[in-house]
From Swiss-Prot:
Post-translational modification: Occurs in 2 forms which differ in the post-translational modification of Cys-1. In form Eudistomide A cysteine is modified to N-(12-oxomyristoyl)cysteine while in form Eudistomide B cysteine is modified to N-[(12R)-12-hydroxymyristoyl]cysteine.
Protein name stated in the entry: Eudistomide
Modified residues (Cysteine methyl ester): C5
Lipidated positions per record (N-[(12R)-12-hydroxymyristoyl]cysteine): C1
Disulfide bonds: C1-C5
Entry annotated with the keyword Membrane: no
Keywords: Disulfide bond, Lipoprotein, Methylation, Myristate
Organism, as annotated: Eudistoma sp. (strain FJ04-12-071)
Lipid group attachment sites (N-(12-oxomyristoyl)cysteine): C1
Length: 5
């Protein structure tokens, strides 16, 4: 899951 998960 860009940019963070």
């Amino acid at each position: 899951c860009p940019p963070l998960c």
